[in-house]
Amino acid sequence: GHVLSHNSGALRLLGVEEPEGEVNVLVLNREEPFRQAVDEVLSGHRSQQMLRLNGRCCQLLANPVMQGEEQMGAVMVLLDVTEQEQREDLRREFTANVSHELKTPLTSISGIAEIMQSGMVKAEDVQGFASDIYQEAQRLIALVEDIIRLSQLDEGAVNMEREDVDLFQLSLEVTKRLESAAQKNDVTIKTMGRSVQVHGVRRVLDEMIYNLCDNAIKYNRRGGTVAVTVGPVEGGVEVSVEDNGIGIPAEDQNRVFERFYRVDKSHSKDISGTGLGLSIVKHGAALHDGQIRLESTPGKGTTVTLLLPQG
């Protein structure tokens, strides 16, 4: 079949120059899916194929053009569906990760309950088994709450009521709530700086600071410190959370804000958490037109800084 007409968008996706004169359609592309679509449509059948063209994911739709019973030609349409495919890949990955994260505590709960149901547990051990079930149930609740929160931030469904928030005071409240967790890990947590105002969603700002501090405690060392510093800077206000813990390798630093991403998976098994905390920080920063800066040296510690517009 020969090309009767085309547009520049199709040529751009195919990565070919403007053809001179009448050319065979297969000159444009000789990949098997393209050839199959041409064969099918010239035989009077509709065809739909997926193509990889110059790093882009494209959908090829081909339909015969009929006049009565006679086929007069065919129309082929190329659609760039790269972004849709990327979103679908992210959705599949997210679903797989959620399924795995849900299965782990559920398996533990089921196993413990089965042992208790069988009557194999001594009376003095029941309290310990019940405590294990409670801890796994709390882990499930935290995971579900984080998934819901992340979904709300994704869709902009968070209660968007904004107010003036003193970030220094908010940071003091957050570190106060985390003092017990810090003590259990032999970590000292402190807040420094002065009052600065932002106009934002208090609950989201609270969660952002909490998640950063919580991570700094969990991935710290015995006798370590977590320092939260709040203050004005050129262009807005900053909240930085600095620890002297295990640090993050350079190759992982661009990925730590991805959902469920764990830097050291073997070490992370011993650390509680949903794997969604930093992703919530990332989405919360975007909600407030803010920026995130991460600096880390393995073995020395990590500093995560939030830059937010001043209220």
Model-inferred region functions:
Residues 117-124:
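Short acidic helix/loop segment immediately C-terminal to the autophosphorylated histidine
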Residues 289-290:
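Conserved glycine-rich
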Residues 248-262:
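Short conserved segment of the HATPase_c
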Residues 19-83:
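PAS-family sensory/regulatory modules and their coupling/dimerization elements
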Residues 181-196:
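Short conserved segments within the C-terminal catalytic ATPase subdomain
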Residues 135-140:
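Short alpha-helical segment of the dimerization/phosphotransfer core of two-component systems
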Residues 155-160, 193, 197-203:
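Conserved micro-motifs of the catalytic ATP-binding
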